Each structure stands twice: as C-alpha cells, then as structure tokens.
C-alpha cells in the first residue's frame, strides 16, 4: 500500500499523509470473528489512570486474530485483506479446506487467492507458519512465540519482522527489529515474512482531531501542571522545572535505568541497548 498526500485545501489537510487503503476490503468484518470492545479510558479496575493519554475515539469491534496457527497441514486460501482498527497491521481472512474461517496477520506480498498453510515443515513463503525446528536459518519471520503454544507475541506491528539467525542447544536465535538478539525454544511457532503496512510510521495525521478519533488524548507537559500533579509543576511564571527531568512519580525519565531484572533476561544474548554509552 502506498502513501497518499493531500492538497492543502483546509488547514487540517495541510501536510496530511495517509495510507492508501483503496485495495482493502470495504465491507463489514465476519460476524462470527468479532466481539464487542469496552473502552477503559486508560483506567484500571479501581478507576485510576494507569495508561495516560487514552480516551474517546471511534467505536470499534475487536477482530479475533489467530496468533497460534496450530491448525497443521490444512491449506487455507486468502479470501480478502482487511483493515483492523485495533492494530497497525492489516489482517487477512483465510478459508481452510474444511470450511473454517479465520483472521491472521497479513504479511507483505500476501495477495487474495494465495494459499497458506501451517505445519511442522512447510514451504518458506509469506503467510506459512512453522516451528523454528523446521525452518531454514536466515528466514525473515513475524508473529514469533515466546512460549510454545502461547501464540505469537513478537514482531506483530506494521512493517516489523525478526530474522532467524542460528540454533543453539534446543533454542533458536532471533534478531529483532530493535537490534536485540534473543533465544526462544525451537518448538515456538513463527510465520514467514514481514508484517504488512510498512509505511504506517510515515503517516502524518495533519490535525489533533484525527488522533482523537484514534482514542489518543493530549500529552500535557509536567511544567505546565500544578505542584500536586507533577514534580515539575508550579512556580511563578514559566519555569524550567528546577530539577533533572522526572516522571510524575519522581523517577528519572531521561535515561535512568529503573527496570527490574526479569527471569527471561537470561535468554537475551545481546541487549537492544548494547550500542549505548555506558551499557
């Protein structure tokens, strides 16, 4: 899909660059593969804001996407490529030989009428899924599982991919878009190809209202708040904050390391921060 720019006939059109979605399905999604989506406005079960800058936006239906791809050795044909408001990638509706319908993430170069299949060892072509144990080294993949059978978790956003670079003692080594080199079990599934819609990051929405339609609220600077709301708040007139930049909870926000170690850190061979100074 190409980018589409607009003539500045109004201020909101000036600089507007959007994805040309003219080739996507224009109808409704399959009713049996959608469910209602309740808006949280960024609040958790106690009513407190746990994710800032969320709220409002157009009503959505959640498309149930198959991230597991565990229907082995049953070919499926791509019926259509669809827009999904819940993710940056496009999704593909596939019909299996036994008649079952499912949504999968659409990789680049997947077209209507193409055949896809999941299995222990399949052809290396976009949309086919297999475990790393049956995959040749060097393959570009997406929708990578971290735990066998859990479903794909890595490389699911538009244009992303990982590369299978080696095997080591029952583990597969993969290089992620961030530069991180990590290991996952060879039994983990992955889908061949890079995720569709690679130009997503080149869009310019042109006006605040389009971001509000997407459910994104304004980002307020700490120095513009009151002292009760942020450590940088308050003061007479405009101030610089008066201290090193911190989050609303007082943690350093410009490069300070605040994350705790996780058990899965031992599977990271090379950190995505490896090139940074002092890492």
From Swiss-Prot:
Keyword Cytoplasm among UniProt keywords: no
GO molecular function, a single term: rRNA binding
UniProt keyword annotations, A-Z: Ribonucleoprotein, Ribosomal protein, RNA-binding, rRNA-binding
Region forming the signal peptide: none
SUPFAM superfamilies xrefs: Nucleic acid-binding proteins, Translation proteins SH3-like domain
Stretches for region Disordered: 224-279
GO terms (BP aspect): cytoplasmic translation
UniProt xrefs under Pfam families: Ribosomal_L2 (PF00181), Ribosomal_L2_C (PF03947)
HAMAP family: Ribosomal_uL2_B (MF_01320_B)
Family of the protein in this entry: Belongs to the universal ribosomal protein uL2 family.
NCBIfam families assigned: rplB_bact (TIGR01171)
Record protein name field: Large ribosomal subunit protein uL2
The organism of origin for this protein: Cereibacter sphaeroides (strain ATCC 17023 / DSM 158 / JCM 6121 / CCUG 31486 / LMG 2827 / NBRC 12203 / NCIMB 8253 / ATH 2.4.1.)
Classification lineage: Bacteria, Pseudomonadati, Pseudomonadota, Alphaproteobacteria, Rhodobacterales
Name of encoding gene: rplB
């Amino acid at each position: 899909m190409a980018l589409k720019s607009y003539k500045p006939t109004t201020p909101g059109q000036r600089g507007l660059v959007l994805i040309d979605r003219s080739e996507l399905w224009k109808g409704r999604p399959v009713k049996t593969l959608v469910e209602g989506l309740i808006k949280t406005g960024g609040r958790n079960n106690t009513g407190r804001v746990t994710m800032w800058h969320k709220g409002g936006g157009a009503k959505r239906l959640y498309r149930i996407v198959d991230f597991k791809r565990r229907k082995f050795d049953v070919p499926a044909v791509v019926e259509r490529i669809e827009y999904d408001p819940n993710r940056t990638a496009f999704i593909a509706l596939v019909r299996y030989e036994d008649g079952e319908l499912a949504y999968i993430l659409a990789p680049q170069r997947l077209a209507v009428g193409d055949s896809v299949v999941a299995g222990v060892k399949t052809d290396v072509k976009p949309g086919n899924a297999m475990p790393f144990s049956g995959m040749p080294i060097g393959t570009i993949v997406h929708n990578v599982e971290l735990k066998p059978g859990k479903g794909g978790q890595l490389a699911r956003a538009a244009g992303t991919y990982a590369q299978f670079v080696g095997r080591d003692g029952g583990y597969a080594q993969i290089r992620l878009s961030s530069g991180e080199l990590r290991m996952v079990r060879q039994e983990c599934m992955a889908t061949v190809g890079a995720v569709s819609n690679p130009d997503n990051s080149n869009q310019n929405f042109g006006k605040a209202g389009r971001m509000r339609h997407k459910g994104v609220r304004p980002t307020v600077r700490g120095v513009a708040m009151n002292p009760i709301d942020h450590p940088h708040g308050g003061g007479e007139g405009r101030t610089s904050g008066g201290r090193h930049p911190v989050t609303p909870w007082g943690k350093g926000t410009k490069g300070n390391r605040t994350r705790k170690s996780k058990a899965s850190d031992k599977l990271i061979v090379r950190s995505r921060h490896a090139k940074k100074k002092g890492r």
